[in-house]
Regions:
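Conserved active-site histidine-acidic residue motif and adjacent donor-binding/catalytic loop
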Residues: 1
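Flexible loop/turn connectors
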Residues: 9, 13-120
Length: 121
């Protein structure tokens, strides 16, 4: 949260300010939101927020934080599988680069929706 508080202090100096912030993780987003709210900024009416980690804190803060859920279990499973394959097929040369994409999930909540645009999904 401390990094979010520092980022919010910098954001308050900006003119014009951004319409939205996509934070590196939920704690940073929450730190920014709390700091900006203390400064009188209305979230999401003035600045919308999205976090990245789908922490339990996303549901505790007001407004509830929109957040991207990462498929952490699947990441671990794929990483372990790749590591075991490398161990089984060990050689002195490094194999070709491999890129793997996993599907995250955007959980839309109040922090990213202006009151006049909110609807129940």
């Amino acid at each position: 949260m401390e990094s979010g508080q520092k980022a919010a202090a910098e954001l308050l100096k900006m003119h014009p300010r951004p319409d939205a912030v996509f934070a590196v993780n939920d704690p940073a987003a929450i730190g920014m939101i709390k700091t900006l709210q203390k400064a009188g900024i209305r979230i999401p009416d003035e600045i919308a927020f999205v976090g990245f980690s789908e922490s339990q804190s996303a549901l505790i803060i007001e407004p509830n934080l929109t957040s991207v859920a990462q498929p952490t279990f699947e990441m671990g499973r794929v990483a372990a599988k790749l590591l075991l394959e490398q161990i089984r097929n060990y050689s002195e040369t490094i194999g070709p680069h491999q890129s793997i994409s996993l599907q995250g999930k955007l959980n839309i909540r109040e922090s990213s929706q202006r009151k006049d645009q909110m609807h129940i999904q």
